[in-house]
A protein has these predicted regions:
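Membrane-proximal intracellular helices of multi-pass ion channels
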Residues: 4-276
């Protein structure tokens, strides 16, 4: 692999390469491993990486978000790999884990590289990849999606609510890295996730109105909003968006901008009163 092929795309989690078949062109376990490491690191909060390198933060794994992000990728890789192995899609367990882990890291970090055609994978593997495409990496990185920070807080809110139901008189606080999260922050996280899913649903419905099948419509909208790149169906990891109707391409372009600007940054442009 030449240095210009994919190094910058991996660091920036942008996914662009010089080959039509992406990283599958090289068919190298060594290249896959190096790129996986690069993508995984690029999905961590850059400020946290800098603080760790300069000695201001002594252990990057002390961060709850980092542990959640890396742990999620590990669990998802194991689930997908075992699913592919038991379905006899790949001849050996290590081979299945190799392709599974690369694809999981790629979609979670929203890099969009591919080493295999995930359209032929098992339904369980596809569901896990969809989950990864929604959650994605940490805030403060170059990745898109809902972000691990928000999803971790959402899970904490659900757990706290269940505990509150069991102990109505208890005073429960939600903490992140030892810091109590204010209600305003929790409300904003909930609002963002609901709004994100609402636009995802709207984009899916809009695409189906123009004859695009449901899987392609959903995955294209999801991949566009999360800036992931590849989806499933007509926009699978070994395909592209060229075959979609022009109006659907415009819709997905809008979703890309919406997701990249964290939704509310773009919505404000349409409300002149907010400019004052």
């Amino acid at each position: 692999m030449c240095i210009r092929d994919s190094a910058m795309s991996a660091c920036a989690t942008s996914g662009f390469g010089t080959k039509n078949t992406s990283i599958a062109y090289f068919d190298s376990a060594a290249i896959d491993t190096i790129l996986m490491f690069t993508m995984a690191v690029a999905g961590i909060h850059f400020g946290l990486i800098y603080a760790t390198v300069t000695g201001k933060y002594n252990n990057i794994f002390r961060s709850e978000v980092t542990r959640f992000y890396l742990g999620m990728m590990l669990v998802c890789s194991l689930v997908v790999g075992l699913s592919l192995y038991f379905a006899d899609i790949y001849p050996g367990l290590l081979t299945a884990l190799r392709y599974a882990s690369f694809q999981v890291v790629s979609v979670v970090t929203t890099t969009g590289f591919a080493t295999a055609d995930s359209n032929v994978w098992t339904p369980l593997a596809i569901i896990v990849l969809i989950f990864g495409s929604l959650v994605c990496a940490s805030a403060g990185s170059t990745s898109g999606g809902i972000k691990s920070n928000r999803m971790l807080l959402a899970f904490k809110m659900m757990r706290t609510r269940l505990r509150q139901q069991q102990h109505p008189n208890a005073v429960l606080r939600i903490k992140m890295d030892g810091v109590i999260q204010e209600n305003e922050v929790l409300h904003l996280v909930s609002l963002f996730i609901v709004t994100y899913l609402a636009f995802l649903l709207a984009g899916t419905v809009f695409s189906t109105l123009f004859g695009v099948d449901l899987m392609t419509s959903f995955s294209a909208s999801m991949a566009s909003m999360g800036n992931v790149g590849p989806g499933f169906g007509q926009v699978g990891s070994m395909s592209n968006y060229a075959g979609l109707p022009a109006v659907v391409k415009f819709s997905n372009t809008f979703l890309m901008l919406l997701g990249r600007l964290e939704i509310f940054g773009l919505i404000q442009l349409f409300f002149i009163k907010w400019w004052r």
